[in-house]
Structure formats: structure tokens, C-alpha cells
């Protein structure tokens, strides 16, 4: 390991790269994808960090997880298949049993080099394997798993999954099942249910997550960076009490922090007052379908809520007003579900600029934190937003995560934005907090 600028550079040596197939014969069939599955045409990733366990010194995590993957694919055999295009342009899964790409690697450092994965380090890219951007969709691996061991005995599981196969909740279910296999269970505790025909949304718009170029995007010369900020629950609860003095309203921690993020981003980017801006966030709709989707359904079952308002009106209004706009967007999404659409036209307005859009994902209640391969629960869970060299513009993105043990108890915001805006964003969000409390949350900006 060596220090390069502000980064602790480390090297990962690839030991083996293999295809892992189901350990028992699996059905060879064609499976349909739902309308929502067809919209989610992009990879997403998760990083699970595990500390060394003195009770398992002789165990090889890569071997254990590789064998568990082979076992769990008996139940989740579609992951071992490949996508193919139908004549109408929709996708389906051909269950070929070709397998999941699995990589074993070894880092030349201990886990301390990761620093909770809060601030972007180019070396982190070695922890997740990504296919080339120009890979044909029918050649894509639906799932890629990499296990990287560190010199201290700890390890990182980096998984890259294609969105059409499952959503975050469904993938958490898969990882939990794989962990159960690693701990010696003979079958998953939750029976996986494919049944994509249960999601019948005839009026879904043909919008794909990877096609954000439909939004007008000015060229940004800066490479986006990833860093984090923690807002502790003491501050959130104080803000909640102060706001409720104005109006007796039930306010969630997500709504409060999302409102702070939205307003701070607008100010930091100095968006003109005449512009309309949007806050986008996904919501799990499994229990909102009529009838509700069955327990174990791991396909995409989310909708994109869209909070939208004029910059002048947002900045001249109160924090409560912004929160109520966010609450209204939640209600509107459920209303749209009843009318058989999960994405309104306002979400994909072609006149919206990237700089006017904020996207938030909330992982705080994800099952990712409980995935135990036999070394205990993950000590840290994170994601890595990967900007390709040719991408000159992206929406500002936030992931809400649980704070790690060395941080205050609160919401950890993983942020992805141009570096020139980070300092201003911190100033703005702290200024808003100071209106309600005198103690400002610790940050790592």
C-alpha cells in the first residue's frame, strides 16, 4: 500500500475467474420479465465488508461463498441464465444454466485502507468487476460476484447485478439465501418466487434507467467524486420537534433529511430561481399491489416518486413546505399505482436538466446489513457509483445508509457530485440545521 495524494492506494491481485453454475440440474426454459423489470436496464452494485473472525481463521471465505453460490443457484436459477430480446423490444430471461461470473482476489493491505468506503478512492474500483459498457445485452452476466480477501483476514464481497433480474429488496433476499447456504442450511428460509406475470402494469412508460440521456445534460468537465456526511438522530429529532410546533404532522427521518438535501443542493449549485427542480426516489410497492405481491417475490416492485417544484417557491418557503411536497409525491405514487402506472411523465420530462435533478436511494432498512456468511454481519455496507470516462454529466445522487460503528448514530449520506460543489453543499446544509439546533452534525467532507 502506498499513499497517492489524498488516497491510500492498494493493489488487488486477481486469483481466479470462473463461471459458477447451479450444483444440481436446473430448468431450461424461457421466463418473462415484468414491465418494471424492462425499465430497470442498468447494473447496480453493493459492497459488503466483513471483519476477520478468530473462530474461522482456517476457513477460506472465497471457497465458502463460491460453494454457497452454486447451491443457491439451484433455487435462483434465472441468475445463471442470459437475457435475450423479444421481437417487440422487451427482454426475457433464457435459463441456460451458463452460470454466474465469480472472481476471487487478494488485496495487499488490511481493511483499514477502506476507511468505511466513505470517500472515493480509485483503488476501490478493484473490489467490483464491471463488464465493458459496449457489451451486448445478450452477452451480459445477470450477476457478478467478487470476493476480495485482505491481509488482516477480513474480506469484501462485491456484487454487481443487472436491474432487470431483481430490485434491491429482491437482491437482498438472494444474498441472504446465499449466506444461509454458506452457514450450512439446506435450502433458503424464504422460497424465491419469480412469477413476473403478477406485475401487470399495461400503462408503464417505456423508460429505461440507463437512458437518462433523454434529459438535457450540459457538459460538466469535472469528474464526479463520492464522499459522505452523517446527520445524527439527535439533530433529526430536534428538527422534527421544532417543525411539529408549526404543524402537528407525522414526519419521517427520510422526509426531513431528503428535504435538507434537496434545498442544500439547489443552493450549492446556484440553480436559477425560474427553474423547476425534481427530487426522485424509489419506493417498494410490494404491499401496495392489489392483491399484495407474495412473500419471496424478488422481481422489481418499485416505483419512482417525483417531488417537483419551482426553485423560487422552494427557497422562499419553509422546510415544512418542502417536506410536504415530498410527502405528497409518495401519495401520488400510490395513486398512480392504482391507475396502473409506476412512473409519471413528470419523472422523465425531456426538458429537465441533469443539474435540476436529485436522486436518492434509501438503504437504511436493507437486509444487506444482516447478510452473514459465517463471519458475522457485515461491518459496513456501501455502494460505488461508477462514472465512465465518456460520461460528462450525471444527476446528483445520494444513498442513505446506516452509520458505521465509529460514527455518530444517524443517517449516513453517501454523496456523488462534482467536487467543486461539495464544500458549498456542506455549508448550506449546516446553515439550515443551525436554524433549528446549535450543534452541527459531524461530517467527513
Curated annotation (Swiss-Prot):
Pathway: Alkaloid biosynthesis; taxol biosynthesis. It comes from the Eukaryota. This is Baccatin III:3-amino-3-phenylpropanoyltransferase. The lineage of its organism: Eukaryota, Viridiplantae, Streptophyta, Embryophyta, Tracheophyta. The keyword Protein transport does not apply. Belongs to the plant acyltransferase family. Optimum pH is 6.8. Acyltransferase involved in taxol biosynthesis. Catalyzes the selective 13-O-acylation of baccatin III with (3R)-3-amino-3-phenylpropanoyl-CoA as the acyl donor to form 3'-N-debenzoyl-2'-deoxytaxol. Its EC number is 2.3.1.320. It catalyses: (3R)-3-amino-3-phenylpropanoyl-CoA + baccatin III = 3'-N-debenzoyl-2'-deoxytaxol + CoA. It comes from Taxus cuspidata (Japanese yew). One of its GO terms (molecular function) is phenylpropanoyltransferase activity. It holds the Pfam family Transferase. Keywords: Acyltransferase, Taxol biosynthesis, Transferase. The keyword NAD does not apply. GO terms for biological process: paclitaxel biosynthetic process. Gene3D superfamilies: Chloramphenicol acetyltransferase-like domain.
Amino acid at each position: 500500500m502506498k499513499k497517492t495524494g489524498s488516497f491510500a492506494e492498494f493493489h488487488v491481485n486477481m486469483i481466479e475467474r470462473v463461471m459458477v453454475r447451479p450444483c444440481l440440474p436446473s430448468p431450461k426454459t424461457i421466463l418473462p420479465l415484468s414491465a418494471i423489470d424492462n425499465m430497470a436496464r442498468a447494473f447496480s452494485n453493493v459492497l459488503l465488508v466483513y471483519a476477520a473472525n478468530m473462530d474461522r481463521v482456517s476457513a477460506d471465505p472465497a471457497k465458502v461463498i463460491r460453494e454457497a453460490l452454486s447451491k443457491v443457484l439451484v433455487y435462483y436459477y434465472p441468475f445463471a441464465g442470459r437475457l435475450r430480446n423479444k421481437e417487440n423490444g422487451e427482454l426475457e430471461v433464457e435459463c441456460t444454466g451458463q452460470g454466474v461470473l465469480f472472481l476471487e482476489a487478494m488485496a495487499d493491505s488490511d481493511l483499514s485502507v477502506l476507511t468505511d468506503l466513505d470517500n472515493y478512492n480509485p483503488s476501490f474500483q478493484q473490489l467490483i468487476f464491471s463488464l465493458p459498457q459496449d457489451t451486448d445485452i445478450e452477452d451480459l452476466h445477470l450477476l457478478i460476484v467478487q470476493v476480495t480477501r485482505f491481509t488482516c483476514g477480513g474480506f469484501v464481497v462485491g456484487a454487481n447485478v443487472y436491474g432487470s433480474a431483481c430490485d434491491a429488496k429482491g437482491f437482498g433476499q438472494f444474498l441472504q439465501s446465499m449466506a444461509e447456504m454458506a452457514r450450512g442450511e439446506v435450502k433458503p428460509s424464504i422460497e424465491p418466487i419469480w412469477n413476473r406475470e403478477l406485475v401487470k402494469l399495461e400503462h408503464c412508460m417505456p423508460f429505461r434507467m440507463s437512458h437518462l440521456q433523454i434529459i438535457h445534460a450540459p457538459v460538466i468537465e469535472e469528474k464526479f467524486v463520492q464522499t459522505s456526511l452523517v446527520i445524527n438522530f439527535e439533530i433529526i429529532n430536534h428538527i422534527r420537534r421544532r417543525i411539529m410546533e408549526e404543524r402537528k404532522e407525522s414526519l419521517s427521518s427520510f422526509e426531513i433529511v431528503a428535504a435538507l438535501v434537496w434545498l442544500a443542493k439547489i443552493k450549492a449549485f446556484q440553480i436559477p430561481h425560474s427553474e423547476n427542480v425534481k427530487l426522485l426516489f424509489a419506493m417498494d410497492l410490494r404491499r401496495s399491489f392489489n392483491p399484495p405481491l407474495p412473500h419471496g417475490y424478488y422481481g422489481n416492485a418499485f416505483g419512482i416518486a417525483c417531488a417537483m417544484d419551482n426553485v423560487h417557491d422552494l427557497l422562499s418557503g419553509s422546510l415544512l413546505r418542502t417536506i410536504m411536497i415530498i410527502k405528497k409525491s409518495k401519495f401520488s405514487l400510490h395513486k398512480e399505482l392504482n391507475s396502473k402506472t409506476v412512473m409519471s411523465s413528470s419523472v422523465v420530462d425531456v426538458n429537465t436538466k441533469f443539474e435540476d435533478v436529485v436522486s436518492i436511494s434509501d438503504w437504511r432498512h436493507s437486509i444487506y446489513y444482516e447478510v452473514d456468511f459465517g463471519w458475522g454481519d457485515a461491518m459496513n455496507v456501501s455502494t460505488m457509483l461508477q462514472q465512465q470516462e465518456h460520461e460528462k454529466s450525471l444527476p446528483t445522487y445520494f444513498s442513505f445508509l446506516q452509520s458505521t460503528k465509529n460514527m455518530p448514530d444517524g443517517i449516513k449520506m453517501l454523496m456523488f457530485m462534482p467536487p467543486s460543489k461539495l464544500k458549498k453543499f456542506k455549508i448550506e446544509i449546516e446553515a439550515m440545521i443551525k436554524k433549528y439546533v446549535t450543534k452541527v452534525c459531524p461530517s467527513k467532507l
